[in-house]
Amino acid sequence: ALGVVSPEDKEIKSVEELKGKTLIIAKGTTAETYFEKNHPEVKLQKYDAYADAYNALLDGRGDAFSTDNTEVIAWAKTNPGYVVGIETLGDYDTIAAAVAKGNTELLDFLNEEIRELGKENFFHKDYEETLKPVFGDDTDPDSIVVEGGEAGKN
């Protein structure tokens, strides 16, 4: 899913609040596709590189920045004065291993391992140990972690 980060003193909490404002995005990203398709009324300011996009937000060239929620949540934690007002927006996109078409043996093996790890709540436990120190207490692990191969499930 996408997230939207903005200055704390001008927090954007809904897509409706982006009307009349400038949203910074990186070119060729899911954020660009999502906003062009679903919210053409939002003015987009596009950058070729993420560093340029974040610098544009820091410099005040736009009102907010949108990209993958995991990225904006972590960025806001390390940049005081910024907050993620929209933590989950659009489709849940997952970053996961891929298997070549036709390799059913490997696919079946991985799917079974993921199901078994899900029964142990492995991914949430791993989140607590590795990612929670980055994202903090106020981030919902279910907005980041897929457990047992099913989004939004514990």
What are these regions (language model features)?
Residues 6-23:
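Flexible hinge/capping segments at coil-to-helix
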Residues 30-47, 84-86, 114-154:
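Ligand-binding clefts/hinges and TM-proximal coupling segments of bilobed small-molecule sensing domains
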